[in-house]
From Swiss-Prot:
Its EC number is 6.3.2.1. Keywords: ATP-binding, Cytoplasm, Ligase, Nucleotide-binding, Pantothenate biosynthesis. ATP binds at residues 30-37, 147-150, 176, 184-187. It comes from Clostridium botulinum (strain Okra / Type B1). (R)-pantoate binds at Q61, Q153. This is Pantothenate synthetase.
Amino acid sequence: MNIVNTIKDVKLIIKKWKDENLSIGYVPTMGYLHEGHASLIKKAREENDKVIVSIFVNPIQFGPKEDYSTYPRDLVKDSSLCEKFGVDLIFNPETSEMYPNKIYSHINVDILTENLCGEKRPGHFQGVCTVLTKFFNILNPTKAYLGEKDAQQLAVVRKMVEDLNFPIEIIGCPIIREEDGLAKSSRNAYLNKQERKSALILNKSLKEALNALESGEKNSNNIRDIIVSKLNKEPLAKIDYVSIVDSITLQSVEKIQSSILVAIAVYIGKTRLIDNFTFKL
């Protein structure tokens, strides 16, 4: 397994692979890898000749009061996981490699970023789309693998790839959970013991909503009320948003008539966690 830090070096390796007509699976990450990332890597390994994982904490997708400086980093642990699951190359550039000069060009995806995290984290998806555009151009992958836990990100990236004619297939992979139901996240490392216990309220509230939907409830306000009521019973939980949106357009819906995304963002103490599920009639 190679660990490469420069665009020049990674392009040389990729040119060789492309000359040999090898398919490339790409897993973009910010590091501090866990079983959720491992599931993406395993899927990429099954479907491609070569697998690349990028590890880059992207500064332009963080807001001024967000956790860029404290975001957990552990390249030794990450490298071990990547090697275990058969990654061929880790691309781990410095910020100065990705952004050697002040950046004036940005990628925006409209409409899909109006709600959910797009509304609550201004500029976040512009940063995500801009850095992924750079990575797609540098790495030229055949397929890219993203987790469904970041459901809005998955939808936004799919639309960007479609609109800009990137010759890349975007593959969404299911949420991976702890045994007690908490969605795997690098930010779970921030939680103390009590917060970790309190964080289970996210999945519990979504389960109650899913039960109501499966019992025939079609009013999105009622579904939202079920989730809010459950979350409000947890003293350490502070709701950022609870949204029921069309799973394709990500626009709010009142009456549930087709496939919907039920998505929540909740602060447990100072840690912001997200979770979701998709429901199809």
